[in-house]
Amino acid sequence: DPNLDTTRHLLARCVAEGVAMVELCLPFRNAFTDGATLQHAHARALQQEASLQAVLQLVAEFSSRIKIILLADSSHTLRPLGIEQVLQQAAAAGVAGVLPHGLPPRLGESFQEAARQAGLPVVGTIYANATPETRRQVLGQTTAFLYLVSTYGRSGGAVEPSDLKCQIDALRAHTPCPIALGFGLRSPGDVGRAFDAGSDIAIVGSAVAGQVEAALKTGGCPIASAGDFIAALQKEAHDRRPA
């Protein structure tokens, strides 16, 4: 966002700042779980024709320097292009794991098998208000890390930290996988609070896209604006993340 060249520069900045992992999304229409900021980012990327092959080329360029998780939507990317084909191509490009967006847990077993065949770990997504059965399904299908959604609603909302530690502790008792906290982390302070709550990974998405959007609107440099913001996030992560 807004184009592949900007994304390339931002990936290079992530490498320079020591970011451990990046979630790279294949843009898609009707991103109903995303707030306005990420919906605008999807739209800008689609206008630049950010195809699967173009995104995977970026992955191939950077996969030896930083772990890249590929976020692919079930309805708009995986099923239309073919789950097995997408996963095999992603693995060949060097993707470190895959996050299937919009995939119901009841369909997760077949996806997990396809990912296993491709040699790709799967990121499981779980909401705080998930039913016990849904939790059981997601935990059983997760092989990379578990993405705990901090707030129910659309991405970019405020974090409610009051019971996050309890939720993370409860999940940790049932999975050996690292636990990531995301959906609503907007500042270095939020990143610090995520680690204070016991998460292993803090995910910031909308706020980074917001830096790009703000720079585009004001005639600034999105690479510098988003890059400096990433540096501030990474500094907080480095200072607060458990050793």
Could you tell me what each predicted segment is?
Residues 38, 135-173, 211-217:
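Glycine/Thr-rich beta-alpha phosphate-binding loop at enzyme active sites
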Residues 20-31, 93-99, 103-107, 146-156, ...:
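Glycine-rich phosphate-binding active-site loops on the catalytic face of alpha/beta enzymes
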Residues 1-65, 80, 143, 218-225:
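Conserved N-terminal beta1-alpha1 strand-loop-helix module at the mouth
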Residues 3-16, 130-141, 181, 185-202:
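Catalytic cores of alpha/beta
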Residues 1-3, 71-81, 104-105, 126-130, ...:
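Glycine-rich beta-to-alpha transition loops that act as phosphate-gripper elements at the mouths
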Residues 172-180, 186-243:
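Alpha/beta catalytic cores of nucleotide-metabolism and tRNA/nucleoside-modifying enzymes
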Residues 63-73, 115-125, 171-184:
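Short beta-strand/loop segments at the ligand-binding rim of alpha/beta enzyme cores
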Residues 81-88, 160-167, 222:
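Charged helix-capping and loop-helix junction motifs
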